[in-house]
């Protein structure tokens, strides 16, 4: 117990030190993400209790999602009242300044959360004139805070992030998302999955795309691809990977990631190889 208290003290001191190094804008985002994350962590404990109840946790999780989104909306609106919003739960709020828009996923990994699996995150990104300029991904279960600003690098807590340096697909572990009932073209995905399985060291499916992208930025995953994504899923993670020295494109090799709802990411070599592999003819 004493060791846990000491670790928390060190962590809190590191966060305070980092607050001094971050921009005022990023600090606002961090505070909003961590406040929402603490709310989710409390709710997650209750979800685990509801797993064994007759009612089940479904309604409670929906409330937790909305609570987290409201916390973020309140915090960011207070700090930057002229900025717009694009939120997973509440949709779009037009900006007053015509330039800035927050992209918010208050609970990425909802299904994991619902089933008591501690793999979920809060994701916040800021668009300025259509370009992502700042991003925060917070994993409450592991108390991992990922941050990035355009031109300022990407960080996990106080550690600078770099994408993995592997240069062969055969040595790489690749993340993906698997389409479920009523979503995505399963036949096309199975072809892509078969191709990637045949050329890599392994495939991981975390169920929280924001964390997948953060893991690519930090070198835990060598690459990632998925279809059917939304701006709030991808915004923060795209910036983190680029600021960590990685490459990101849509499945056509272009930059219309939000338009195509597709993403392929990794270091320069792995990203190109993964792009080629998933696009192999049937």
Briefly describe each language-model feature range.
Residues 1-6:
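Short, small-residue-biased leader/transition segments that mark boundaries at the very start
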Residues 10-107, 247, 269, 276-279:
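N-terminal subdomain of lithium-sensitive/metallo-dependent phosphomonoesterases centered on the IMPase/IPPase/PAP
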Residues 29, 33-36, 135, 154, ...:
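Small-residue (primarily alanine) positions within well-ordered alpha-helices
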Residues 40, 65, 76, 110, ...:
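Residue-level signal for inorganic ion chemistry
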Residues 52-53, 77, 92-95, 137, ...:
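Short secondary-structure boundary/capping segments
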Residues 66, 70, 89, 106-109, ...:
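Generic detector of well-ordered alpha-helical packing
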Residues 96-157, 170:
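DPxDG-like acidic metal-binding loop motif
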Residues 162-282:
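An extended, acidic
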